[in-house]
Amino acid sequence: MARSVWKGPFVDGYLLTKAEKVRESGRNEVIKIWSRRSTILPQFVGLTFGVYNGSKHVPVSVNEDMVGHKFGEFSPTRTYYGHGADKKAKRK
């Protein structure tokens, strides 16, 4: 179920302050975050975030197409190794 429009997008408060500090400094450094649930806002465009996936920080460069999505969508938590091979076909 989608979030109510009258509530607005959810963003952790510390994330806004971190992004503001990086914008003011002018340096293009990776902002490490653990908040996968936060929504990407227009003021984050052009910044690079290190989104934690449970084991490491995955670098995510934000562009205009990502606005409105969550940070967690761009940092996969599971590694897919493919389906198991058919053992009968392997023996022959």
From Swiss-Prot:
GO cellular component: cytoplasm; small ribosomal subunit
Keyword set, alphabetical order: Ribonucleoprotein, Ribosomal protein, RNA-binding, rRNA-binding
Domain of life: Bacteria
Membrane-spanning ranges: none
InterPro entries linked: Ribosomal_uS19, Ribosomal_uS19_bac-type, Ribosomal_uS19_CS, Ribosomal_uS19_SF
Gene3D superfamilies: 30s Ribosomal Protein S19, Chain A
Biological processes, Gene Ontology terms: ribosomal small subunit assembly; translation
GO molecular function, one term: structural constituent of ribosome
Job description of the protein: Protein S19 forms a complex with S13 that binds strongly to the 16S ribosomal RNA.
Recorded family membership: Belongs to the universal ribosomal protein uS19 family.
Protein's name in the database: Small ribosomal subunit protein uS19
Originating organism: Agrobacterium fabrum (strain C58 / ATCC 33970)
